[in-house]
Amino acid sequence: MGIICLIIGLAILMIMCMKGIHIFISVFTTSLFLAVTAWLVSPDMLNPVDALLQVYTGGLGGYFGSFFFIFVLGAIFGKLTAISGAADSVASFIIGKFGERAVIPSLVAACAILAYGGVSVFVALFTVYSMMVSLFRKANLPRRLIPAVYFAGAGTFVMIMPGSPQIQNLIPMKFLGTSATAGLVPGMLTALFQITLVIIYLTWLFKRVKAKGEGWVEDEKTAKAEEGKKDRQLPNVLVALFPMLILLVVLNILKWDPAIALFCAIIAALIVYLRYLDWKKLVPNLAAGTMEGVTSLFNTAVIVGFGALVMTLPAFKESFQAIAQSGLNPLVVTAISVGALVFISGSGSGALSIAMPMIAAMFPATVVDQGSLHRVATMASMSTTPPFNGLIITVFSVCGVSHKEGYGPVGTLTLAIPLLAMMFMLLLYTFLPASIATM
């Protein structure tokens, strides 16, 4: 009964998200439903009030506090690149040098390089967002596809590649004693397979959009911003890129905290963009950037709180145990259990943190190659991303796009294609010689 209630709750949440209902209302309604039904099924569990006030708010508040400066400073940095004309400068350079056809490949490559270089996917979003808006506007592409292009670069093949510094590739190391390049050959072949599918899909998608005559539409906010940009001198492209390079150097070479790296980038931007900023409007613009960051953070934190609540439900634990004890091949068990946890909790890293201790205990090195287990677990954590995933919520919020407008392409890139890639990886481990598969 508890599992049925959990499935109904997830269905309610997905339907409300797709209908465009505000994420907090959607999540709170679903959380209340799950808390009440779980209490009715298992009276010894926390009562609904405590479940919401302790577990849910604990997850929400913990995430809000941990990521506050990353979101706020990231939004301020993005605002500075926009109001200074730096983002427009980079966009004009790309369009001028390579033409409109290079817009999508350039953005996908930029996002992928940032993510594989170790930049948090949240920080990467704020780094490239203003540039993406400028490029989409100049190329007359619809705003609703900005999230799809971002995920194509930062949220698909890069996240599962051997050597990636993203958290999904690092968590299994802690429990399996493996390295970041574990499962090198199957991992790289799967990443190549996924890249191919992403390119094919994006090519088809943008041809279809162009054929339908769909293009950039200014809303009132962006129209006013564009009006103020006319006849404005733009910074040289090297000047425009300098603060972004500072961010990458401080984050990836000096290995400083992401919040400190963003702060350094903001200081660099204020210095090198000095002559391009309207200082009378600077404080209001920074205040607007701050509020945009807080809004995005809150929208993400509410779904993290939901994940924390779901993970305490007896039905959640029963589901995992049933999969883990099914007697299937260890790699298949890992793929199914981690994938199911991701879809239920809405978090790839959260699912890995829960699943890996149990998987490591059930499948030691004497049973299965630990590098193979690592690579399958990482792939599985990115193969069943639900519509209520925290990063998806954040990207839509920052881009000003609703689920109804943008989830179709994003769902293809973060759910359909990764599922195919997961199956491809399992086939590789089935048919490749052991000497190659375990490299």
Model-derived regions: residue spans:
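Long, contiguous bundles of hydrophobic transmembrane helices that form the permeation core
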Residues: 3-6, 10, 38, 42, ...
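Hydrophobic alpha-helical transmembrane segments of multi-pass integral membrane proteins
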Residues: 70-73, 97-133, 326-366, 378
